[in-house]
């Protein structure tokens, strides 16, 4: 059996996972082989990476807190590493469980960030410092690979979408070449989500400019927001697609003329698929890691110049829903006019 390369990415946030995909591919390039990924199901990695040629297989682990969960997950990963003959394990995080499992499985090369108790189990000597945990995820991983003597020229990932799914979406949504705008109307942290009244005002402004089909995306628990927006506008060309999973959302994003939405995982996914995407950054600081992301910020500037969100005197995030109101509908509409092709 060929020895395998494992990458463990334990975070469950979609946007963070997409930010880390270039690093996962980089490990595949370093190793000159496909990799086996271990991550959380909430990343939707199996759907997102279905058409990528640097992935051999994907395993989901919940990475739950609690002593018994720790033991259960260590034993599961240890068996996985042993059964699939792991040659190397890369851990793109500071947690110890994968490193312990790899040690017990007698994996010779275990690379991780270090910093915490993980440093007792990994084999790489060049590790990150505690202060590195405060910098952005991308900068942190960039530093890690530089210290490992595997520098990366970081470029935002391009995700492939199955052609048959694209064709189905085109036929269903745009049989007569209708122009589509997709909206991400919620967020995993709703305090930083744009209010529905602003989405309504924006859609009405866009409708005055040209005819578009508007598709509203949200998590199923926030589907009611899409219904409320549709009820206010009463336009047959506005559709509630909040019931869809990532696999079905991806081709819709790809066939859209533009995506407009909150700073969220779907914004990153849309940009990675190749769609021009306006990100609404009222409660969070904008970023420029992708040419496809067009930041819409408040007239009075970024929420912060030093951190990605506003912090109080104790360093805790200020979760004030009013911060999202800083970006007005006209701020987003101006970005739309500047970047859409009529």
Predicted regions mapped to residue ranges:
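Catalytic machinery of carbohydrate-active enzymes
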Residues: 1-342
